[in-house]
Swiss-Prot record:
Similarity annotation: Belongs to the hemerythrin family.
UniProt GO MF annotations: iron ion binding; oxygen carrier activity
Taxonomy of the source species: Bacteria, Pseudomonadati, Pseudomonadota, Gammaproteobacteria, Lysobacterales
Coiled-coil stretches noted in the UniProt entry, renumbered to this chain: none
Keywords: Iron, Metal-binding, Oxygen transport, Transport
Protein's name according to its UniProt entry: Bacteriohemerythrin
Function: Oxygen-binding protein. May be involved in a storage mechanism or for delivery to oxygen-requiring enzymes. The oxygen-binding site contains two iron atoms.
Residues holding Fe cation 2: 61, 76, 80, 115, 120
Length: 153
C-alpha cells in the first residue's frame, strides 16, 4: 500500500480539525514506513500514538459539536467509541505478537477517509457557524483557545 496523500475533499473547513486529520494521516504513513523497515518496536510506537492522538482528537471534536448544539453529537460519539474499541483490539493483537500492520493501516485509512467525508462533513457547517458567532462575541481566542490548550497542550 502506498503512502496516503491528503486530498482537498477531506477539508471540512475548520482549520484546527483539518490539521488534526492531516496529522493522523501522517501517523498512518509513519506506520507504513515502520512496517516496511521491519521495525516492530516502531510499529508499536506508532500504533500507541495513533490511539492516543485519535482519542484526544475525538474528545476535542465532540466538545466542539456539543458546544455548537449539533443534534447528532451522541451518534457521532458512538461512532468514535466503536472505532476506539476496534483499534484497541488491533493493539491487543499486535501486543500478542500478531502482524496486524497491513490490516490496521488499510482499516484506518478507509475508516478515516469515509468518516471525514461523511460524519465530519455533516457537523462542519453547524460548528463553523457556532465558532464564527463565538469569535464575534469573544475576541481573543476564548473558548476555542482554552479547549485547544486543554487537549493539545
Amino acid at each position: 500500500m502506498a503512502l496516503l496523500v491528503w486530498q482537498d475533499d477531506l477539508n471540512i473547513g475548520i482549520d484546527v480539525i483539518d490539521q488534526q486529520h492531516r496529522r493522523i494521516i501522517e501517523m498512518l504513513n509513519h506506520l507504513h514506513v515502520a512496517q516496511a523497515s521491519m521495525q516492530r518496536a516502531a510499529v508499536g510506537e506508532v500504533i500507541d500514538e495513533v490511539v492516543d492522538y485519535t482519542m484526544s482528537h475525538f474528545a476535542f471534536e465532540e466538545e466542539l459539536m456539543e458546544e455548537a448544539g449539533y443534534p447528532f453529537c451522541a451518534a457521532h460519539k458512538r461512532v468514535h467509541e466503536v472505532f476506539i474499541k476496534r483499534v484497541s483490539e488491533y493493539r491487543m493483537r499486535f501486543q500478542a505478537g500478531e502482524d496486524i500492520s497491513d490490516e490496521l493501516r488499510t482499516m484506518l485509512s478507509r475508516w478515516l477517509f469515509n468518516h471525514i467525508r461523511g460524519d465530519d462533513q455533516a457537523y462542519a457547517e453547524q460548528v463553523k457557524a457556532h465558532l464564527n458567532q463565538f469569535a464575534r462575541e469573544h475576541q481573543g481566542g476564548g473558548w476555542l483557545g482554552r479547549t485547544l490548550k486543554r487537549f493539545f497542550g
